[in-house]
Curated annotation (Swiss-Prot):
The keyword Lyase applies. It comes from Klebsiella pneumoniae (strain 342). PROSITE patterns: UROD_1 (PS00906), UROD_2 (PS00907). It comes from the Bacteria. This is Uroporphyrinogen decarboxylase. PANTHER family: METHYLTETRAHYDROFOLATE:HOMOCYSTEINE METHYLTRANSFERASE RELATED (PTHR21091), UROPORPHYRINOGEN DECARBOXYLASE (PTHR21091:SF169). Belongs to the uroporphyrinogen decarboxylase family. One of its GO terms (cellular component) is cytosol. The gene is hemE. The lineage of its organism: Bacteria, Pseudomonadati, Pseudomonadota, Gammaproteobacteria, Enterobacterales. Pathway: Porphyrin-containing compound metabolism; protoporphyrin-IX biosynthesis; coproporphyrinogen-III from 5-aminolevulinate: step 4/4. Homodimer.
Length: 354
């Protein structure tokens, strides 16, 4: 494999010295870029874009042509696993993802297959291999999956939700059915991420988008327990390098200590958590990724730079910080503002690494 020309993202995740703080953006390949919209129109629809390795590679590389980002992230969706399990994923205009056959009972769970990542999800692995080839060692490639809990919310609710009453009803009235589903999902995610690593992903991230809707006790039992199982089952070395693992629970700032106990290398922070506080609490165990409010990118350039400076100062001197937004970039952000953000991170972080 090609030697990595820029490995500062991987080094920062392992709390090793870097010259400047590395930066990438969640959803950096996305609808805020006109070139993304053009490629998506060419594909026809979102899942066709995900399933075409050449086009998925093209949109993965688009933000790297605009900005000096320190990592590429696979263009895919967290719902590829439930789709491969046969739930009938489709996208409703203005509604987001929906499933034709949501999970309603333990009997439904028992019927679910565990997808073979090189068969039913082979299109994802083809995309990983294509992107790695086209990156030519410029920056590392991040692979990812949704967490078992987050995937289960979509599978049981039948799509996006605001109150999560359907899955919480299952959690409190039929916990054994939900545990059976989460167990299957944990196995599926482990296989899926390991296949991404073998195909060329140099770091992986688990997105627990909806863990923050749980009580502390339920988070431990129904979300973190299964992420811990996945971390235990992941390949941690490939191509002679450690493959760092990042866990990200949106709204999970109060559980960082428990998350750091899983054996992951880094924790993602949303913008509601103070990064200085997070470093005091868990910085001796894990790297931290984050955590500017994505809405800050609507601000004028000086305000964006001021916010970058504040977060860098909050983390302070030394290693173990990957700069990112606290969640995905919004689709109506001016691409020039994203450029201001990336440039500011590199320029303003130099003194913190001397």
């Amino acid at each position: 494999m090609t030697e990595l020309k820029n490995d500062r993202y991987l080094r920062a995740l392992l709390r090793q010295p870097v010259d400047v703080t590395p930066v990438w953006m969640m959803r950096q390949a996305g609808r805020y870029l006109p070139e993304y919209k053009a490629t998506r129109a060419q594909a026809g629809d979102f899942m066709s874009l995900c399933k075409n390795a050449e086009l998925a590679c093209e949109v993965t590389l688009q933000p790297l042509r605009r900005y000096p980002l320190d990592a590429a992230i696979l263009f895919s969706d967290i719902l590829t696993i439930p789709d491969a399990m046969g739930l009938g994923l489709y996208f409703e205009a203005g509604e987001g993802p929906r499933f034709t056959s949501p999970i309603k009972s333990k009997a439904d769970v028992d019927k679910l297959p565990i997808p073979d990542p090189e068969q039913e999800l082979g299109y994802v692995m083809n995309a990983v291999r294509t992107i790695r080839r086209e990156l030519k060692g410029e920056v590392p490639l991040i692979g990812f999956s949704g967490s078992p809990w987050t995937l289960a919310t979509y599978m049981v609710e039948g799509g996006s939700s605001k109150a999560f009453t359907v899955i919480k009803k299952m959690m409190y009235a039929e916990p054994q059915a939900l545990h059976a589903l989460l167990e299957k999902l944990a196995k599926s995610v482990t296989l899926y991420l390991n296949a991404q690593i073998k195909a060329g992903a140099q770091s992986v991230m688990i997105f627990d988008t909806w863990g923050g809707v749980l009580t502390g006790r339920d988070y431990q039992q129904f979300s973190l327990y299964y992420m811990h199982k996945i971390v235990d089952g992941l390949l941690r070395e490939n191509e002679g390098r450690r493959v760092p693992v990042t866990l990200f629970t949106k709204g999970g700032g109060q559980w960082l200590e428990a998350m750091a106990e899983t054996g992951c290398d880094a924790l993602g922070l949303d913008w509601t958590t103070d990064i200085a506080d997070a470093r005091r609490r868990v910085g001796h165990k894990v790297a931290l990724q984050g955590n500017m409010d994505p809405s800050m990118l609507y601000a004028p350039a000086p305000r964006i730079e001021e916010e970058v400076a504040t977060i860098l100062a909050g983390f302070g001197q030394g290693e173990g910080h990957v700069f990112n937004l606290g969640h995905g970039i919004h689709q109506d952000v001016d691409p020039q503002h994203a450029g201001v953000f990336v440039e500011a991170v590199h320029r303003l972080s130099t003194p913190y690494h001397q």
